[in-house]
Amino acid sequence: MANHKSAIKRHKQSQKRAARNRAAKTRIKNVVKAVRAAVLQKDKDTAAQALTAAMSVLDKAAGKGVIHWKKAARKISRLTKAVGSVE
C-alpha cells in the first residue's frame, strides 16, 4: 500500500475509475446481448429498439473514453447490419 498521501488518493481514484469503467463495459455487454437475442428471435421491432439503446450506450462509453471510438463504431455497424438482415 502507498505511504504518501497523494499516492493513497491516486489509488482511491483509480479504484473508483476502474469500478465505473467495469460498470460501463457490463452495460455494453448487456445491451449487445439484447440486440443479438432479438435478432436470433427474428423480432424486428424489439431488435430495432434494442439497437437504439445499444447505440446510445456505446456512443456514451466511447465519448467517456471507456472504449475506443472506432471499436464503438465497429460494434454499432455490425449490430445495425444484423438488425437489417432480420426479416
From Swiss-Prot:
Query: Listed GO molecular functions?
Result: small ribosomal subunit rRNA binding; structural constituent of ribosome
Residue runs in coiled coils: none
Q: Which UniProt keywords apply?
A: Ribonucleoprotein, Ribosomal protein, RNA-binding, rRNA-binding
Name of the molecule in the record:
Small ribosomal subunit protein bS20
Asked if the record carries the keyword Iron-sulfur, the reply is no
Q: Does the keyword S-adenosyl-L-methionine apply?
A: no
Q: Which GO terms describe its biological process?
A: translation
Q: Where is the organism placed in the taxonomic lineage, from the top?
A: Bacteria, Pseudomonadati, Thermodesulfobacteriota, Desulfovibrionia, Desulfovibrionales
- InterPro entries noted in UniProt: Ribosomal_bS20, Ribosomal_bS20_sf
Q: Which family does it belong to?
A: Belongs to the bacterial ribosomal protein bS20 family.
Annotated organism of origin: Nitratidesulfovibrio vulgaris (strain DSM 19637 / Miyazaki F) (Desulfovibrio vulgaris)
Q: Which SUPFAM superfamilies match?
A: Ribosomal protein S20
Its function, per the record, reads:
Binds directly to 16S ribosomal RNA.
List the GO terms this entry assigns under cellular component, sorted alphabetically: cytosol; small ribosomal subunit
**Region of interest: Disordered:** 1-26
